[in-house]
Structure formats: structure tokens, C-alpha cells
Curated annotation (Swiss-Prot):
Protein source organism: Baumannia cicadellinicola subsp. Homalodisca coagulata
Active-site residues annotated for this sequence: E138 (proton donor/acceptor)
Gene3D superfamilies reported in the protein's UniProt record: 2.70.40.10
Name of the featured protein: dCTP deaminase
UniProt pathway annotation: Pyrimidine metabolism; dUMP biosynthesis; dUMP from dCTP (dUTP route): step 1/2
SUPFAM superfamilies for this protein: dUTPase-like
CDD domains, sorted: trimeric_dUTPase
Enzyme class name: hydrolase
Gene giving rise to this polypeptide: dcd
Stated role: Catalyzes the deamination of dCTP to dUTP.
NCBIfam families: dCTP_deam
Molecular functions per Gene Ontology: dCTP deaminase activity; nucleotide binding
Family, as annotated: Belongs to the dCTP deaminase family.
Length: 193
């Protein structure tokens, strides 16, 4: 069962679902909550790496990721981040989300942005029960023109689905929870698999 707008508000009122800062009622729709783009980004820097061997030794994978990813870029609210056609960047939501053990979240991009070529997530649309932290967005410009993105703009929507029971292995209690509590545009940690 997907939570409707009044249930989303009730779950937040009862502190079962935590979204900080709490969205105003205007951003809580029939079955979703509109979320905002945060102020932290990472991009692929200019490099001469021919490929990243994801099946290679972990140290080599770590070194390759560190070589190709920029340090975190933090914008002010007046700054604009330009994403050019064919470019991928990591960004973060403004909101920090905490899900209880019996609720899963789903991230969807906005249709208005998709119609301009902006993909908000490549494959990572599921937010596991027990999640705590900001959500990293894998944003890609599939359009023909550069797109200017600003912190605080509407970027995506979250919906919430009730599980048949509480998860016995919620995200924040798993040893493999390598992105739990993230607050910035965290680069891939595939080397920790």
C-alpha cells in the first residue's frame, strides 16, 4: 500500500517518517512529496583513464574512482550548476530522510525536467527500509542543451510504500550499509562490496 498525502503527513506528525527540513503542505501531493536539489555535487574530472575494471583488485578500483571523481563541490544558493549534454554528475537532496523499518521509499524524477532531457536517477530509485541520510542523485543530461540547476529547485518526488511487516535487516543495521547517514554527494563505494 502506497501512503496517500494525509498518511504521509500523519507519519511525519507521529515521527515515524522523518523528512528534514519538513516539506510544506504545498509539496505534499496525492501520493508523494516533492523534494529539492541540495547544494553538493561531484563530477567526473578530466582524466586519461581508459576504463575502470570493476572486477579488479579493490585497491585498483578505489584508486580509479579517486582519480576520475572530483572532490565535492559545494554551491551557495545563488550559484548555478551547469550540466552539459552527455554529462553525468552526482548531486544530493536538500532533505535528509529517515525511514522506519516497515516503509520503503521510491524516488521519481519530475516529468517537466525529463522533457528537457534531465534524468534524476540512473538506476537507484529504491530507498530501503531503515534508510537514514540524504539521497544521492545520479543526474544525467540526455538533452541537447546545457541545463542550469540551482540548490533549492524542485528535483524529484518521493513516494512511500508500506511493507507486509518490519524488515528484519533494515539498511541502517546492515554491515554492508556503506551509504548510511550520508550528507553529501558521496562517490561510488563499489570497492566496499
Amino acid at each position: 500500500m502506497i501512503l496517500c498525502d494525509s498518511d504521509i503527513e500523519l507519519w511525519m506528525d507521529e515521527e515515524k517518517l522523518d523528512i528534514i527540513p519538513r516539506p510544506p503542505i504545498e509539496r505534499i501531493n496525492g501520493a508523494s512529496v516533492d523534494i529539492l536539489l541540495g547544494d553538493k555535487f561531484r563530477v567526473f574530472r578530466g582524466h586519461t583513464t581508459a576504463f575502470v575494471d570493476l572486477s579488479g583488485p579493490k585497491k585498483n578500483v578505489t584508486d580509479a574512482i579517486n582519480l576520475i571523481m572530483s572532490n565535492e563541490i559545494q554551491l551557495t544558493e545563488d550559484d548555478t550548476f551547469f550540466l552539459h549534454p552527455g554529462e553525468l554528475a552526482l548531486a544530493v537532496t536538500m532533505e535528509s530522510i529517515t525511514l522506519p523499518n516497515n516503509l520503503i521509499g521510491w524516488l521519481d524524477g519530475r516529468s517537466s525536467l525529463a522533457r528537457l532531457g534531465l534524468m534524476v536517477h540512473i538506476t537507484a530509485q529504491r530507498i530501503d527500509p531503515g534508510w537514514q541520510g540524504k539521497i544521492v542523485l545520479e543526474i544525467y543530461n540526455a538533452g541537447k542543451l546545457p541545463l542550469g540547476l540551482r540548490p533549492g529547485m524542485l528535483i524529484a518526488a518521493l513516494s512511500f510504500e508500506l511493507l507486509s511487516g518490519p524488515a528484519s535487516r533494515p539498511y541502517h543495521k546492515r554491515e554492508s550499509a556503506k551509504y548510511c547517514y550520508q550528507q553529501g554527494a558521496v562517490a561510488s563505494r563499489i570497492d566496499q562490496d
